[in-house]
A protein has these predicted regions:
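Short, well-ordered alpha-helix to beta-strand connector turns
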Residues: 8, 24-26, 47-48, 75
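Aromatic (Trp/Tyr) and acidic
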Residues: 107
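Beta-strand-loop-alpha "switch" segments that mediate conformational coupling across diverse proteins
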Residues: 56-60, 68-103, 112, 118
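Switch II (G3) loop of P-loop NTPases
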Residues: 1-24
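Conserved beta-strand segments of the P-loop GTPase G domain that flank and frequently precede/overlap
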Residues: 12-15, 28-33, 50-56
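C-terminal alpha-helix
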Residues: 114-126
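Acidic-aromatic/histidine active-site loop/patch
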Residues: 48, 54, 125-127
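Conserved Switch II/interswitch segment of TRAFAC-class P-loop GTPases
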Residues: 22-45, 58-63
Length: 127
């Protein structure tokens, strides 16, 4: 898979909980804003540099907006960026292409570009 990342500046890896990467990295806990995640978040042992990234977000869903407000009020390390629910992501996965290449003007492609910018702008990842 390493041969397939030539030309990319950033790689996102989905690692199992508790598996520590051996290279410097940003730690993001990716969750849906739902009741299941809400219950589990308060039992999660947070690393000092870990941030919470909400995915499949829809600002029209009152429950999701309410949970975000609760998480902010509770002091959870919420990243000031959400990945909205966008059909372009599923279509890109089905086509086995990065969403930025498959649908570069989609909302989720712009949000992932913003996430990449945030990751790169933070400088060297602490480890």
């Amino acid at each position: 898979w390493l041969a397939g990342i030539d030309g990319y500046d950033l790689v996102l890896l989905d690692l199992p909980l508790g598996m520590a990467p051996v290279i410097p990295c940003r730690r993001l806990l990716v969750v849906n804003a739902d009741a299941n995640c809400h219950v589990r978040l308060h039992r999660h042992p947070w690393a000092a540099d870990e941030r919470l990234l909400v995915t499949q977000f829809s600002s029209q869903r009152a429950l999701q907006q309410g949970l975000l407000d609760l998480w902010l009020a509770g002091g959870l390390p919420l990243l000031n960026l959400h990945l909205h629910r966008d059909e372009a992501m599923a279509e890109a996965m089905a086509a086995k292409l990065p969403v930025g290449r498959y649908a570069p003007t989609s909302l989720v492609a712009h949000e992932l570009a913003a996430l990449a910018t945030w990751c790169l702008a933070e400088g060297e990842a602490p480890r």
